[in-house]
Amino acid sequence: NAFWAGVTGEVTYWDPFRIAWDVNYGSASYEDEKMNREGWLASLLLEYKLDWGTPGLYGWYGSGDDSNPRNGSERMPVVSANGNNGFSNFAFNGNPYIAREGVLGTNMTGTWGIGARLKDVSFLEDLKHTLRVNFMGGTNAPKMAKYVSHNSFKDSASVTQYGTSYDPMYLTTDDYALEIGLTNTYKMYDNFTVMLDASYLALWLDDSRSTWGKNPMANFAKGGDGIYDAWNVNLSF
């Protein structure tokens, strides 16, 4: 059995100031209790529209797994792995065009984050820029790390948002990441758009023995100090 419910809304009374929010809850139950999933994900956006662009602040929080893998997952179950969002184009799936994305995960379940952006900045006709900075972390119990690091990459799917998911990363409450991204779009013709996306992601994994130990993310890194980074420059049409 599975159930989802959500509510979304916005306040534009003080236009050009806008407040928007989104709250979702989902659960999925199976005969085997270890496969059960139940959780929620919420986000909040504050933005102010100006003539040259729209600055904004936002944040999100998704429930994470507790320290007991036998009672199922406390992350919200999802049907599609393509969980698009408007906050992150690199760490999560947020790019509407062909791009490299989802470096941390296909959606934001099991994570929290705060961010700031300058959206649709434009000084030339049909050319827009969006700059974003996100700081995020996991909401999963550190103890759950051993159930990932002590198994193969494929087996680690059992502690992600649903059994057949292969998210690249599994963040605990002791893990953090910083994302900086710049998206540029040029509408050359009505039906032809050129997009240049540049992003950088720094990741800090807790390499203490209580979390990832000396081998953070089995089959992801061999040794190291728990600090990793990735970058991407992507051109699409």
List the model feature ranges, each with a label.
Residues 1-45:
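A compositional/structural signature marking long, glycine- and acidic/polar-rich segments
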Residues 5-7, 42-44, 116, 182, ...:
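Membrane-embedded beta-strands of outer-membrane beta-barrel proteins
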Residues 10, 20-24, 56-60, 130-134, ...:
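Transmembrane beta-strands of outer-membrane beta-barrel proteins
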Residues 11-13, 46-50, 61, 120-122, ...:
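Residue-level signature of outer-membrane beta-barrel architecture
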Residues 15-19, 52-56, 124-129, 186, ...:
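Repeated loop/turn-to-beta-strand initiation elements of outer-membrane beta-barrel proteins
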Residues 26-169:
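Extracellular/periplasmic loop regions
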Residues 190-220:
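C-terminal beta-signal and adjacent terminal beta-strands/loops
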Residues 227-237:
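Outer-membrane beta-barrel "beta-signal"
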